[in-house]
């Protein structure tokens, strides 16, 4: 099998340039990486990544004041497909709070049953949570909600059966429950999610979803069972999403919810695909503007405003500018309050490039 490559610069993608050569099997698209395909279409390889530079200023009654300018995320990924087999390897080069140097995704996937049933083995996102399963490069707010950060398990090693139809998705898997991506299966988790979109057009979407996770632990007090309910909708330039979370942790019940709304001021619609929203794609050379508002209440991880894991409330307002498909500039203000009365605030600015 013969694969032909044409050299190209990643900066072309950053500038919003789209190039394609069907005869050579090479494609460079803004915000979508570089794809190589074999002449007979049986094999493909793609490389891409993201870089997020953040400035954030936090003022908390608990942790005081802090100002930081650092790399929020710097990732590169490689993914490919040959016949009925696919893989993805995504590496975290740098990340605030963790330092980077780890594998975000590292899995092998069998696709021979078609889109309705696929098997993925390796480190991957567990199927839980609308906002969690929306990529960090696509979420409307600069940071996920405090509720998602606390309840959603994120990435772990495991085996998942998942699939999708025209307006529905499902996922069910067994994962290691250590929460650090290790290969120790001493503690396991069973996690699942289903979604259904009774309305799904280019300009109108109604999404319903639900998920659960049951996580074993070495100590009974650390056993966790959680579920969530999802609701999302879009109508032209307006979009909204909400989630309710409930967990029993060693006999202690905690819960919370968030609701978020956005308005694309320049008229574009936020795309919806496979049970999640995608980022705004500007329809003109002037770019697209988006305003975002979120409110959350309950037990969650309010670390962005310096309040830690606690019962609290938080309001977020933000504005995003998308000059092209690859670049995003964002500004947000978060105001949080613990149930006990302590306050925390954060101003965050971000420059993001996806290649």
Task: Annotate each language-model stretch with its function.
Residues 22-27, 59-63, 134, 212, ...:
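Outer-membrane beta-barrel pore domains
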């Amino acid at each position: 099998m013969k694969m032909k490559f044409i050299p190209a610069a990643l900066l072309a993608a950053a500038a919003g340039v789209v190039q394609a050569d069907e005869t050579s099997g090479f494609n460079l698209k803004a915000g979508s990486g570089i794809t190589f395909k074999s002449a007979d279409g049986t094999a493909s390889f793609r490389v891409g990544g993201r870089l997020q530079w953040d400035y954030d200023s936090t003022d908390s009654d608990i942790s005081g004041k802090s100002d930081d300018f650092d790399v929020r995320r710097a990732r590169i990924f490689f993914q490919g497909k040959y016949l009925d087999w696919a893989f993805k390897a995504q590496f975290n080069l740098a990340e605030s709070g963790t330092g980077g140097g780890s594998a975000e995704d590292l899995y092998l996937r069998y696709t021979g049953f078609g889109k309705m049933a696929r098997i993925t083995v390796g480190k991957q996102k567990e199927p839980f949570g609308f906002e969690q399963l929306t990529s960090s490069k696509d979420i409307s707010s600069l940071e996920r909600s405090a509720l998602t950060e606390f309840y959603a398990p994120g990435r772990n090693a495991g085996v998942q059966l998942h699939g999708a139809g025209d307006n529905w998705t499902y996922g069910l898997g067994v994962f290691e429950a250590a929460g650090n991506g290790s290969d120790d299966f001493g503690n396991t988790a069973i996690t699942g999610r289903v979604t259904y979109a009774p309305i799904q057009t280019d300009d109108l979407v109604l999404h319903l979803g639900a998920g659960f996770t049951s996580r074993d632990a070495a100590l009974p007090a650390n056993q966790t069972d959680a579920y969530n309910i999802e609701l999302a909708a879009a109508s032209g330039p307006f979009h909204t999403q909400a989630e309710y979370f409930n967990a029993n942790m060693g006999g202690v019940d905690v819960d919370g919810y968030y609701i978020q709304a956005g308005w694309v001021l320049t008229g574009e619609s936020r795309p919806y695909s496979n049970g999640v929203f995608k980022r705004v794609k500007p329809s003109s050379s002037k770019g697209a503007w988006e305003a975002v508002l979120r409110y959350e209440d309950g037990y969650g991880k309010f670390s962005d405003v310096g309040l830690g894991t606690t019962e609290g409330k938080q309001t977020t307002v933000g504005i995003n500018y998308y000059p092209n498909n690859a670049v995003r500039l964002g500004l947000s203000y978060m105001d949080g309050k613990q149930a006990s009365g302590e306050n925390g605030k954060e101003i965050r600015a971000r420059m993001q490039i996806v290649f």
